Structures are given as C-alpha cells and as structure tokens.
Amino acid sequence: MSVIEIHGLKPLLGQVSIQGSKNAVLPMMAASLLHKGITVLSNVPLIQDVSCMRDILTCLGCRCVCQGNCLVIDARQVSETRIPEAYVTAMRSSIIVLGALLGRLGEGESCYPGGCLIGARPIDLHLMALRELGAVIREEDGILYARAGKDGLTGARIYLPYPSVGATEQAILASVLAKGVTVIRGAAMEPEIRQLCHFLNNMGAVICGMGTSQLMIQGVDVLHDSSFQVEGDRIVAGTYGAAVAAAGGNVILKGADPGSLRVPLGLLEQAGAQIIRDEEKKEIQI
C-alpha cells in the first residue's frame, strides 16, 4: 500500500495555478466529434482520463495533438462508429461519446461502462434520452448498437427523473445536430454542464437555459471551428482551499472561479478562514 507522509505544523504560502476541470474537458472532447473540423482546447489537465478520451477520439478517426496544456482535435476524418471496449471499461464517462456519434454519423456502438452486463444499469437514463430523440438501441452480446432514423435524430421533450450529469451531457450532445427543438427538463445544473453549453454555443450550437434545470436546444445543421479555455477544476481548488484553512498560511489560487465555489468557500469562512474573491481575474486568496 502506498503511504503519504505529511510533516505538518507549517503554514502554506505562495500561489498555485488550478488545472483545468476534468469533468468539464471530457464532455468537451467528446463534443468535438460533432464538428467536421478543428477544435482547440486550452488549460487541459494532463491526467490519465484525458489521455484515455484522447485515445478514444484517435480510434474513431480524429487527429489529436497536445502542445503543453493545449489540445488540438481535428475531427474531419471521423468514420469509425464503435467505441473501443478497453477504454469504455477503463473510464465510465466515455459512454457520452455515443450521443456525439449518433449526432455526427447517425450510429454508434459501445459496451456498458465498467463492463456492467447485468442488473441495474447506471446508464438507463442515457439510453432513455437517446430513444426519446429517435434512436433505436438494441443489445447483443453485451454490446449496445444505436442507430438514428434515416432522417437523423429529432428534437424531443426529455424529462430526467434524476439530475444525472452524464445523462444530461448525453442528451445535450445528441440534440445539438438533431432536427427541431429539444427541451431537457430535470437537467443537472453543475458548473461543468454550464461550461459544456457555453463551449457548444461557441461552436455554433443554440442552447438556452444554462445554469437552470431546463435546457432548450435548437438543432443546427453544422458547427464551426472554435477555441475554448477550460475553467479551473473546482474540486481541486476546493481541496487546496481546505488545506490552507486547516494548516494556516496565505495562498492565492489562480484560475479558480469563485462563483463555482460559493458553498465550500462559505463553509471555510464559517470555520474562520479569511477569503478574498476576484471574479474578474478568477482568483481566490485564502
């Protein structure tokens, strides 16, 4: 077992740059499949899940180039419709690629995330949303085969009985290029969903209601090349903030959005921490 040994009784001092949000960048990478062109993402965290999603995109026909924390995705040659099983079982969030493939190519194939073949499946809401949009989905030997109709996916009213982040992302990705209007009620309201919607709108999508439990998506025919900076990871920033509050000291968290950390920052202040927020610079001083 690995051991982390901490020698405490010392205050934490200085500044730290908060890496880009993992939970925001992964659906953005999946969304790049919707555009027959080039997408540039900056402030991309150099972590295993990002490498896994990059490998998935490469297997589907994308050309991905990393330049430091910048990721360039060229999706012009996407033609493969099956998400490699090894990656789906390694990273459960990879299932959202299915919605992007349906939107772009009209079909997609995937095993169940984590290799789950029996019992209650956590992607039931994903499949329900795709079916509401007109996808025909069947299972054979543990593989999901999803197909859109001959005219593609069609906008629909989707109600999520639980505000699942993954199912919300799945429905958004499948709806962007669908014909007509899609309304998602009971949508997740996490900051990462808001980021995904802003990212897609930056590519030419038409999404309204960001930050609320009801999203409205007007389908478009095509998207365009775009560049987007991923916001700092609120979980990482909150962890650093808690460490400073516990150990004492003075630290500036650069690239941390105070608006996404209202609750944890409020709790730290209740515990006695002094916090300065800079919404414009995206900085927090504790």
Task: Map each language-model feature to its residues.
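Structural preference for solvent-exposed beta-strand-turn elements
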Residues: 1-286
